Amino acid sequence: MIGIIINGAILGAIFSLIAVGLNLQYGVTRILNIAHGEFLMLGSYITYIFFTLYGVNPLVSLVISGPIVFILGLLIQIVVFRKLVHVSRSAEELESRSLLACFGLTFIIQNVVAEIFRGTPIISAPYLNVSTDILGEPVPLNMIVAAVMSVIISLVMYLVLRFTSIGLAMRATVEEPAGAQLVGINIFKIHAVSFGIGALLAALAGSMLVMIYSNITPYIGPQYTFIALAVIILGGMGSFIGSLVGGFCIGYVYYISLEIDPLITLAVVYSFLIILLIIRPKGFFGR
């Protein structure tokens, strides 16, 4: 039981961080980025490259993988999604076009990385491969570090959204786009920055994952996109707190099902999600 509580919480912390990025992108831009997991995969590979080739501590590599993927996300929003906003005549048209664009991005990023690495799975960075006892349960230290860092990053993001000018501009853009423009907020710039930050958060989560999981491949992205979608739907679309609560709920469901049979993990997660949505269609914190 202690093992379930600890390991479920560790997974929940990482899942929450992944979902916070996706929820931010959707909340501000109204684009559901189903290529979100590819940014996580890129963060994993960047961390792995710097660790194996240059001996860079995976925690230090956060300041490398994050900015690189932030810039990539920023450019993708400006070059792809901003153009789609301008040429789409309705919200429904933008939704369908952006969905197709996200599918395209998924395959492009996957295939570029697969071509570079020849599709060979990477083995997790051998970082802090020792265990410590928590309430009599041995827990790998790298998993604890990954979980704690995920929580810290999520809390920092919350503080940024609540108490900084960029956070205020993001919230104004979400709540009243026309009013935000009237007071001088460049909502297109806010869209780009928000999308970039969402990609950055996914990359940081990917850096955490490569510390604790082996067999990272160019094709892991969709799995974590589906997990992030489950988290934000459960917590409530557009709700930051919902992402945190939903992340821990899905983390426990995921870990328990993983212990029972790894082949049914995602099926169990989505079955759990469907049952809860029947009871509460808008999620825990949906409005």
Residue ranges and their predicted role:
Residues 2-53, 82, 88-92, 236-237:
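Single transmembrane alpha-helix segments in multi-pass membrane proteins
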Residues 175-178, 182, 186-189, 261-287:
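Cytosolic-side transmembrane-helix boundaries in multi-pass membrane proteins
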Residues 1-18, 46, 58-61, 88-97, ...:
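Membrane-interfacial amphipathic/re-entrant helices at transmembrane-helix boundaries
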Residues 1-7, 160-165, 194-232, 254-263:
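Inter-helical junctions in multi-pass inner-membrane proteins, predominant
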Residues 85-113, 221-233, 262-278:
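Pore- or pathway-lining transmembrane helices of multi-pass membrane proteins that form conduits
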Residues 84, 93-163, 190, 256, ...:
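Transmembrane helix-bundle core of multi-pass membrane transporters
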Residues 138-216, 240-246:
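Helix-loop-helix "hairpin" substructures at the membrane interface of multi-pass membrane proteins
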Residues 55-105, 245-250, 280-281:
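Alpha-helical transmembrane segments within multi-pass membrane transporters and channels
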